[in-house]
Each structure stands twice: as structure tokens, then as C-alpha cells.
Amino acid sequence: SSILASLRAMSHDHSHEHVDPAGLVHEVATRLAAVGQRLTQTRRSIVEALAGADRPLSIPEILTGGAGLAQSSVYRNLSVLERAGVVSRVVTTDEWARFELSEVLTGHHHHLVCSKCGAVDDVRVPDDVEADLDRALAVLAERAGFALQHHRLDLVGVCGACR
């Protein structure tokens, strides 16, 4: 089918490469202020680590990338950043949650999640396929009496490294 062809043709998306650093800092500071918080150096370091990654990161990966960050501080600050809508948690199949900048900052995308190693890759669906998916999900939601606001799609399988 044409949808399968489009999906096969899609490439892994380095969705954060187009984020403007100055605009990002301003948007993050604004979102934090809206929930009564400030953009501290620790929060800035976490946001910079996530913005510089081409996929969602685990806390150990954030700690590796952020000079001098304490694990307890990263946990606390990720929670604040989540509440402010700056960071989203990606549930995976291993023991580590992964974190990424929220879609309001990076744009809508989906995830490929490896059921063996827990790796997560960002992937963007072509606009025409995304529109078809939106319509199909809206119909399913309506039939269930559910008011759909948005969707998140994680495709679970086995990555190339584990195959």
C-alpha cells in the first residue's frame, strides 16, 4: 500500500537539529515562569543535553552529557521541566525512562522502541500519512465516545543492532 511505502521511505529524524538555541532558551524560560519556576543552570544544562541529542535520553545519558550534574538534582529538575511542558517522558521497554524536549518545542514525531535493548529513536511520519493517521484515530476515538486531543505513537520492535 502507499502508506507502507511512505513509512518504509521515511528516515530517522534528528528532530532537534532545527531548534533555534536562542528561541529555545526564551521559550523554556517563559514556560517555566508560567509555573512559577526559573531557568536555572541545571535546567539549562538538561535542556541543552536534550536539544543536542538525536533521540530521547535516559537519566544516565543526561548525567554523562551534563558536566557536574548530580543525579538527584536531575530527577528533581526533570520533574519541574515536565510540569512546565518543556520535557516529555518516553516510556520504553527497559528500566530507564527516556526524556526529550516536548513536541511544542520540537514538532510532532513518533518513536521506534526496541523491545530488546530499550533504545528509542525519533521518527517523523510524512505529512500525508500523518493526516491519514489523524483521521483514523479521530474516528476510533469518536466511536468510543472519547474526545481526542492529540496522539503519541510508539512502534515497538527490534532495532537493527539487536537483530
List PLM regions with ranges:
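N-terminal leader segment of winged-helix/HTH proteins
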Residues: S2-R38
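Short helix-capping/hinge SLiMs at alpha-helix to coil transitions
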Residues: V35-Q37, A51-D54
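Short capping segments at the starts of secondary-structure elements
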Residues: Q41, A53-S58
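Pre-recognition alpha-helix immediately N-terminal to the DNA-recognition helix
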Residues: R44-A49
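A short acidic, leucine-rich amphipathic alpha-helix
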Residues: E61-G65
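Basic amphipathic alpha-helical segments that dock to polyanions
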Residues: V74-G85
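Non-DNA-binding regulatory cores of transcription-related proteins
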Residues: A84-R163
